[in-house]
């Protein structure tokens, strides 16, 4: 099945960036719904092209944007991994809502499903706490559980920002946030072995300048804020109780603490009275499920879940 690509731009809610986005629109087929992709840290929407092709072949419009500080939504390379002088995490959430508004204005009356991966899942979890009633479901891929040290990370990032400036790039902060990720995969070939068991995908990630960069200290502060907020019981209790939510994670994903953190997040949601929460853990898979060796299985599971909750 063929599809058309429509590009769009809009002013970020931070009033500083022009945000670049794409829609993948199936041609000559009855449209079933919309899947909006919220990409992860050090990614961009084009990384999801294979996933988008699969979904469009099954009648779904796919849309997404390069988030602030990523891909084509930067003012200069100096702004890679930088969101705003203050409260950048809030603008990430609002920009995702703007994308929803853009695509639903063009294609009204279709169910919208939000797919968030990694950092994008943190954003998505905050999004559904504020705008959950606009969605028909959400898929949370490679997410994280409660992290008591997130608040300490925010304080350290603030301190570094005051001393070095908000655009400073700290290997120390990176090590605190992600250095642990490769430990289970030693001896590692690259510092990104943890993202996927498919070595070709890892090497593509390493070679891609749009993926292989270090966040600013300000960006890390916003990341830690998202981690703290998305696991906050106060935030979770504002999610619509009947919103269908599908957690997916690899059993060897260090971000999800090898599934333990994800299961804690699922428990938080169920304890808050959310009645339509499902979770699937994929044995031996790592962080980027949609790029894993069994990605076709993952794609099919997502499609089947969407079609089931759409009935």
Feature roles, as predicted:
Residues 35, 39-43, 118-119, 251-252:
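Active-site glycine-rich loops that stabilize anionic/oxyanionic intermediates
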Residues 124-210:
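Alpha/beta-hydrolase-fold enzymes
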Residues 45-78:
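Conserved alpha/beta-hydrolase
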Residues 107-118:
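Alpha/beta-hydrolase fold nucleophile elbow
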């Amino acid at each position: 099945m063929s599809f058309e690509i429509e590009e769009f731009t809009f002013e970020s809610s931070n009033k500083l960036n022009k945000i670049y986005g794409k829609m993948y629109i199936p041609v000559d087929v009855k449209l079933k719904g919309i899947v909006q992709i919220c990409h992860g840290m050090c990614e961009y929407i084009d990384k999801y092209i294979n996933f988008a092709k699969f979904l469009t072949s099954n009648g779904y419009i796919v849309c997404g944007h390069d988030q602030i500080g990523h891909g084509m939504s930067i003012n200069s390379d100096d702004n890679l991994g930088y969101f705003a002088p203050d409260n950048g995490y809030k603008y990430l959430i609002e920009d995702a809502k703007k994308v929803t508004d853009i695509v639903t204005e063009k294609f009204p009356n279709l169910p919208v499903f939000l797919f968030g991966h990694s950092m994008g899942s943190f954003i998505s979890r905050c999004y559904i706490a504020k705008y959950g009633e606009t969605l028909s479901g959400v898929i949370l891929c490679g997410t994280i559980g409660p992290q008591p040290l997130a608040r300490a990370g925010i304080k350290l990032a603030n301190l570094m920002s005051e001393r070095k400036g908000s655009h400073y790039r700290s290997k120390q902060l990176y090590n605190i946030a992600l250095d642990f990720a490769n430990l289970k995969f030693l001896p590692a070939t690259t510092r990104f072995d943890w993202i996927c068991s498919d070595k070709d995908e890892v090497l593509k990630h390493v070679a891609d300048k749009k993926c292989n960069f270090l966040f600013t200290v300000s960006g890390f502060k916003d990341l830690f804020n998202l981690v703290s907020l998305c696991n906050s019981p106060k935030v979770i209790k504002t999610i619509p109780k009947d919103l269908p939510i599908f957690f997916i994670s690899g059993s060897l994903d260090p971000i999800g603490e090898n599934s333990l953190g994800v299961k804690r997040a699922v428990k938080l949601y169920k304890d808050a009275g959310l009645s339509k929460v499902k979770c699937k853990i994929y044995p031996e898979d790592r962080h980027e499920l949609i790029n894993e060796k069994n990605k076709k299985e993952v794609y099919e599971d997502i499609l089947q879940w969407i079609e089931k909750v759409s009935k």
